[in-house]
């Protein structure tokens, strides 16, 4: 009798797990036979946080601890550079963006720099008392840029940063943000700092619109796919897609390709339309059938790093997309597909 009673909790747990798994799409993951990525390891153990290229060969990478590196061979090799800022100021360089020879660089705390000569010289600009810290910068046109902060405030400049004008009238309802993306046409999407909701801002609008998360799981990240629809990464290694940009409350069932105790931190689409998702402890998976099945990447799985950002760069100045995956502790991957 005692044995029967103690088995009841186990049965309940089994039924609960069956119910939970039935509400998800668990695909299973096998290891790919080959990889389109090559590993680059820097001596500097700082974390790479963003990368951009001016043309096919010339680009910059920025990261924590004032890290800035330059490549002149398409990202195959990198050389460390320095910025003209006081040695005692330790900045976390978050974002860099170029359009032609003009570029913008932002960091925390309160750093904005501007170049008009492909990064040979950088000018530090005064921000004044903006709400929040710089989070994302976008080069729009000659002398024109948009700056988003950690409080979801967005500012624009049309005179190379001499003055900034508020684009969002009142971001106070947003609170802080943990993720924020912008499309080339000026649409934004963000995730609240706690991951309990996400918000959208259409180009030309001055008001964020808040949306409920797709489930009780907190949102890790959100972004746009090549068609302009949204994807969502949630706690518990869940992946979701929104197929209708007119209904942002409608999401696919959660896809859970692999349960290894690590969440996915970013997603990206390669030039062939394959979907890549990266996360903790060398987790990097790819789907070649729109998320139905997934494979694990053999190069990434052997690296002692967390993959925090997946970038496929596409702009007029580039003959073809460039791909990089940024990891922690001096690791990045370069696309060779």
UniProtKB/Swiss-Prot annotation:
GO BP, sorted A to Z: photosynthesis
InterPro entries documented for this protein: PSII_CF48-like_dom, WD40/YVTN_repeat-like_dom_sf, Ycf48/Hcf136
Lipidation, N-palmitoyl cysteine type: 24
UniProt keyword list: Lipoprotein, Membrane, Palmitate, Photosynthesis, Photosystem II, Signal, Thylakoid
Subcellular location: Cellular thylakoid membrane
GO cellular-component term (any): thylakoid lumen
Lipid-acceptor residues (S-diacylglycerol cysteine): 24
Signal peptide limits: 1-23
Free-text note regarding domains: A 7-bladed beta-propeller torus, about 55 by 55 Angstroms, with a depth of about 25 Angstroms and a central pore.
Quaternary structure and partners: Part of early PSII assembly complexes which includes D1 (psbA) and PsbI; not found in mature PSII. Binds to the lumenal side of PSII complexes. Interacts with YidC.
Annotated NCBIfam families: PRK13684.1 (NF010237)
Function: A factor required for optimal assembly of photosystem II (PSII), acting in the early stages of PSII assembly. Also plays a role in replacement of photodamaged D1 (psbA). Assists YidC in synthesis of chlorophyll-binding proteins.
Protein name: Photosystem II assembly lipoprotein Ycf48
Organism: Prochlorococcus marinus subsp. pastoris (strain CCMP1986 / NIES-2087 / MED4)
Gene name for this UniProt entry: ycf48
